[in-house]
């Protein structure tokens, strides 16, 4: 197949869950298919990132773009502009006449068999109708993320803004789903939420492509020398991650420290916001920023924590930690959409006291911790290696090209 793949940015560096998911899928697809990848590229993006993209695509087309840094005057001015715009901010900021023109040029001259829109933003730059089969690859239910932002907003002004964005996203997401021949979701939970929110919008049933993990890369590592050490990984400029860490340090960590005074915490991930950096300064927490390899950091943890209150899709970080045989404690939202069993593969805990107790129990009970670690590793190795997930994705593209519905794989 000749595939036109649309995204809002380059996949490199591989520092976000959505980038990782797409990278692994494209890496397998590129072995047999011809992929043209079209996206924005940040001005100043390294030449190495562009060259590295050739591992997953045959051709790379980019449109230059600069995203204002979060917290700057330019960032707030850009956000304010979109308060009165009709599109939701998360989509509207990517609307571009230059991008749309490049898409039209590719569609008119490329002889493509199928077009894949990766996430929602590229949809804003697509023609209303397409002459070739089209697939929307969703990694989240975006409207649900904004609903949770609104519910967890700290003041009435923020709540009003988040509610406005939620309502705009509901309208845009419904319209986007209706425009594609096939919609792919990353979990049964997301599929069910789409069907509940947007009845009648879909051309055919949603196909679920499960989350995978590179089990040969994320393997158990020796050398742990820190007791009572907790680890969290993620892009720290993504609001759900920032909110989760602020919530954990405010409401959960003090309870853990009452029982385990020597407990330590590392927050590993790119672009920590000022609020996250203050956690390191005021609470004795290690905030690393971007690291080249998360594995040595994860390996040092007794417990891997995912205290998210906002989110959608699935958390690749959980499968990565499980693949490294780490005991995970997560909220229900954090583990949403993953085919895991609490008490067997990981521990689910939603209330602060419950979450703290689960962490303390795993720190103290090495036998229970090892049992969960072993079960976690076994689950992902047996069922969720990327090769099998990518084959399902490929089969779905081939089916929509033929005009057929993909065959659902059993979990």
Please place each PLM-identified region on the residue numbering.
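Conserved acidic donor-binding segment of nucleotide-sugar-dependent glycosyltransferases
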Residues: 346-353, 361-366
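Conserved catalytic-core segment of nucleotide-activated headgroup transferases in glycan assembly
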Residues: 207-300
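Acidic donor-binding loop of glycosyltransferase active sites
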Residues: 181, 284, 290, 299-313, ...
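Short hydrophobic beta-strand element within catalytic cores of glycosyltransferases
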Residues: 317-320, 327-331, 347
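Donor nucleotide-sugar binding/catalytic pocket of nucleotide-sugar-dependent glycosyltransferases
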Residues: 62, 135, 143, 162-166, ...
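Acceptor-binding helix/loop patch of EC 2.4 sugar-transfer enzymes
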Residues: 8, 69-93, 135-171, 235
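N-terminal subdomain of nucleotide-sugar transferases
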Residues: 1-63, 108
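A short, well-ordered alpha-helix in the C-terminal region of glycosyltransferases
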Residues: 368-382, 389-392
